[in-house]
Amino acid sequence: TVLIVEDSRFICEAARLMCLHSGARLRRADSLAAARRHLNVYFPTIVIIDVGLPDGSGLQLISELAGASPRIGVILGTSGDDLMNHQSLKAGADGFLAKPFENLSCFQSTILQLLPVEQKPKGPIVLQDAPVLPDLITFRDDLVQALISLKDYLSSKEEGFIRSFLARVCAASGDDYMQEAIKTGYIDQLCAKIEHRIGQIAIL
């Protein structure tokens, strides 16, 4: 079982498809609080933790799990910022997955090489390189959540987090229109562009 701690539904869907291709089952937690509730009940084989989460830094959870006993077999940090690779390893992660998750064979090989010997698949391993194409509905869901958050935000720090979330999701989806829209300085203009894109996806 793989637990992913990630607030983007689109990125989680990409991970779910990769796990499906790999014969693994994925569970999702969208925050540190949700992850801790999950870990109180389940003990996953692998946990993938986004460094930037709505209620705090994923590095904190990585550090907690790395020092826990018994220890989860594989702890991975993930981020759209490659500089977080070093920070994740420093916190105690076994490895790092860069976003967006696009290459299935890279996803599989990263996990396989870190699995404890007793948990590695027996026999020859054929890495797959099938395309991973998450449903656009999950991308729309992320845009809707970002739009709601932008309209309710209370501080520049919250605005920065929402823009960072949008940047990660739009890069993962390859949406050039939205990647350009994020550069808009005014909140009302950005909200209008998000609403426009949501409407376009609904028509598809």
Predicted features along the sequence, with ranges:
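Acidic catalytic/metal-coordinating carboxylates
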Residues: 31, 57-60
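Short amphipathic alpha-helix used as the core "switch/output" element in two-component signaling
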Residues: 59-71
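C-terminal output/effector regions of signal-responsive regulators
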Residues: 125-204
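Acidic, metal-coordinating helix/loop segments flanking the phosphotransfer/catalytic sites
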Residues: 28-46
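Alpha4 helix (beta4-alpha4-beta5 surface) of REC/receiver domains from two-component response regulators
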Residues: 60, 80-98, 105-109
